[in-house]
């Protein structure tokens, strides 16, 4: 038998446990839907060398990054989620490119670009003429060359899940099928941009029910690529990194030109743009 005091303590603890459990579920839900903006990876590219302190290159670079903090400047790029701008002439030309995830356009895009830009310039790759950084919601690249419209085969990385698939619970063919279907949607889905011009969205997300489990995925290509370029980029990176992820429960493969992700849990809001349930 419980004493009256112990019973009262038990009843007091029940709502506390419920509240704590609810809060933990909410935190987990926010994290799983990728609403955070975590740093993922960066690369300092040595090919183009370094710029000198006080040079025209450094001044142009600083001016560009600082302008991103102004809500009235480059608002078009933040609203569309993509911008590529070149300033100056070689050898002091500076090319800045950023791409935001389509469901992170607007203020989220600007916040990510500002954070990533300063992180790359000041902490990760100071004085490098070419560097790239990836966050959850965006990538930022600066370079002394204009490479728009070209597939970048050099700057990439693979982030596999720490957990392996058990048996044949979700086959390689099923994962490839989802990624291929999402790529088809990304290159064939036409929508109007903020100027009313019809263009391929080059992005798709979705989920597929497989028995008792669901497989979630997302693909995105850089907005400067053509439909053919997007297809080629996705095919290359799916094959190139297959050994990295073929036995894993999830993976992120990111490059300068395209990226994809799949997981056994939801990481994209199903109410977001261009989401499909297969």
Swiss-Prot record:
Limits of the Gnk2-homologous domain: 39-147, 160-267
Keywords carried by this UniProt record: Repeat, Secreted, Signal
One Gene Ontology cellular component annotation held by this UniProt entry: extracellular region
Gene3D superfamilies registered for this protein in UniProt: Gnk2 domain, C-X8-C-X2-C motif
A Pfam match: Stress-antifung
UniProt entry tagged with the keyword Signal: yes
Signal peptide residue numbers: 1-32
Highest rank taxon of the organism: Eukaryota
Subcellular location: Secreted
Family of this protein: Belongs to the cysteine-rich repeat secretory protein family.
PANTHER family, per database record: CYSTEINE-RICH REPEAT SECRETORY PROTEIN 18-RELATED, CYSTEINE-RICH REPEAT SECRETORY PROTEIN 38-RELATED
UniProt protein name: Cysteine-rich repeat secretory protein 18
Native species: Arabidopsis thaliana (Mouse-ear cress)
């Amino acid at each position: 038998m419980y004493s009256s005091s112990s019973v009262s303590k038990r009843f007091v603890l029940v709502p506390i446990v419920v509240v704590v459990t609810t809060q933990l579920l909410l935190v987990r839900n926010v994290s799983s839907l990728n609403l955070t903006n975590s740093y993922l990876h960066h690369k300092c590219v040595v090919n183009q060398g370094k710029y000198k302190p006080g040079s025209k290159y450094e001044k142009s670079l600083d001016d560009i990054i600082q302008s991103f903090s102004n809500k009235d400047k480059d608002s078009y790029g933040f609203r569309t989620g993509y911008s590529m701008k070149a300033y100056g002439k070689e050898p002091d030309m500076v090319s800045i490119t950023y791409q935001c995830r389509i469901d992170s356009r607007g203020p989220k895009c600007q916040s990510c670009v500002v954070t990533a830009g300063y992180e790359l310039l000041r902490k990760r790759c100071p004085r490098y003429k070419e560097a790239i950084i990836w966050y959850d919601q965006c990538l930022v690249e600066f370079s002394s060359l204009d490479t728009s419209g070209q597939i970048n085969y050099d700057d990439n990385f693979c982030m596999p899940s720490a957990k392996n698939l058990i048996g044949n619970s979700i086959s390689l063919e099923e994962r490839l099928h989802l990624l291929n279907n999402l790529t088809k949607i990304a290159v064939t889905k036409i929508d109007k941009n903020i100027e009313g011009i019809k263009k391929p969205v080059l992005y798709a997300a979705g989920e597929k029910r497989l028995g008792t489990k669901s497989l979630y995925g997302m693909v995105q290509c850089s907005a400067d690529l053509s439909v053919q370029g997007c297809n080629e980029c996705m095919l290359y990176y799916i094959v190139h990194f297959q050994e990295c992820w073929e036995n894993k429960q999830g993976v992120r493969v990111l490059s300068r030109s395209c990226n994809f992700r799949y997981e056994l849990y939801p990481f994209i809001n199903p109410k977001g743009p261009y989401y499909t349930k297969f």
